[in-house]
């Protein structure tokens, strides 16, 4: 279920991330080691030995000394720690970003939900965000042609039936976007869509979803 590392790397390459894309990592991501270079990565909240749990995207814009953290669920810092035991403060501290002249980093984090609670498409949404970052590094979260295809809802409404049509439409637009921009996705579309379906996690006994709801 969900996206494999190989799939995400192939799709990110198709989307033009090129040498700026550092790859996929587990929760031990060492951080951005070149403070003067535009860079991005897809990071899992769990260790690789677990098979993975949830994908996030991280990006660094050296021009503005800004680090972007994109979570398709838009969880708060506290919820990320509670649900996934994932903390990004340590990640930033152990990276080379602290070596910037003024030791000052701006963190911009997504706060709205674009992915349905039972969807397994978190990695694909991360790829979409990285496309926005590479093309519009000063405003990758919003107000660009890529991310404006999606409609965010308050994270507090993640489980609300009221927003299900919006989140389902987001996933349909995600698939359409990847079909247009990624030859790899087009070749493997049926398999990828099945593995990342909007209701993929609904009947699965997956720990992190239990934590989300309970």
From Swiss-Prot:
GO terms for biological process: proteolysis. One of its GO terms (molecular function) is cysteine-type endopeptidase activity. Induction: Expressed in the late phase of the viral replicative cycle. It comes from the Viruses. GO terms for cellular component: host cell nucleus; virion component. It catalyses: Cleaves proteins of the adenovirus and its host cell at two consensus sites: -Yaa-Xaa-Gly-Gly-|-Xaa- and -Yaa-Xaa-Gly-Xaa-|-Gly- (in which Yaa is Met, Ile or Leu, and Xaa is any amino acid). Pfam families: Peptidase_C5. InterPro entries: Papain-like_cys_pep_sf, Peptidase_C5. The keyword Protease applies. It is found in: Virion; Host nucleus. Requires DNA and protease cofactor for maximal activation. Inside nascent virions, becomes partially activated by binding to the viral DNA, allowing it to cleave the cofactor that binds to the protease and fully activates it. Actin, like the viral protease cofactor, seems to act as a cofactor in the cleavage of cytokeratin 18 and of actin itself. Its EC number is 3.4.22.39. The record marks 51-52 as: Cleavage. Its main location: virion. It is an enzyme of class 3 (hydrolase). Keywords: Autocatalytic cleavage, Disulfide bond, DNA-binding, Host nucleus, Hydrolase, Late protein, Protease, Thiol protease, Virion. The active site is at 54, 71, 122. Interacts with protease cofactor pVI-C; this interaction is necessary for protease activation. All late proteins expressed from the major late promoter are produced by alternative splicing and alternative polyadenylation of the same gene giving rise to non-overlapping ORFs. A leader sequence is present in the N-terminus of all these mRNAs and is recognized by the viral shutoff protein to provide expression although conventional translation via ribosome scanning from the cap has been shut off in the host cell. Cleaves viral precursor proteins (pTP, pIIIa, pVI, pVII, pVIII, and pX) inside newly assembled particles giving rise to mature virions. Protease complexed to its cofactor slides along the viral DNA to specifically locate and cleave the viral precursors. Mature virions have a weakened organization compared to the unmature virions, thereby facilitating subsequent uncoating. Without maturation, the particle lacks infectivity and is unable to uncoat. Late in adenovirus infection, in the cytoplasm, may participate in the cytoskeleton destruction. Cleaves host cell cytoskeletal keratins K7 and K18. Belongs to the peptidase C5 family. This is Protease.
């Amino acid at each position: 279920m969900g996206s494999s590392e190989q799939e995400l790397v192939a799709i990110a390459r198709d989307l033009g991330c090129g040498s700026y894309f550092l790859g996929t990592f587990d929760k031990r991501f060492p951080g951005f080691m070149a403070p003067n270079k535009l860079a991005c990565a897809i990071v899992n909240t769990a260790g690789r030995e677990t098979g993975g749990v949830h994908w996030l995207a991280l990006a660094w814009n050296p021009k503005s000394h800004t680090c972007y953290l994109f979570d398709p669920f838009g969880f708060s810092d506290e919820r990320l720690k509670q649900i996934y035991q994932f903390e990004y403060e340590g990640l930033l501290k152990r990276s080379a970003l602290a070596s910037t002249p003024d030791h000052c980093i701006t963190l911009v984090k997504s706060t709205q939900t674009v992915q349905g609670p039972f969807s397994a498409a978190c990695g694909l949404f991360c790829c979409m965000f990285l496309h926005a970052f590479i093309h519009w590094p000063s405003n990758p979260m919003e107000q660009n042609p890529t991310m404006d295809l999606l409609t965010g809802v308050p994270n507090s409404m993640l489980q609300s039936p009221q927003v299900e049509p919006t989140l389902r439409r987001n996933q349909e637009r995600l698939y359409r976007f990847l079909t247009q921009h990624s030859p790899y996705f087009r070749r493997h579309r049926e398999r990828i869509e099945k593995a990342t379906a909007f209701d993929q996690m609904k009947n699965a006994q997956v720990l992190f979803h239990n934590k989300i709801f309970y």
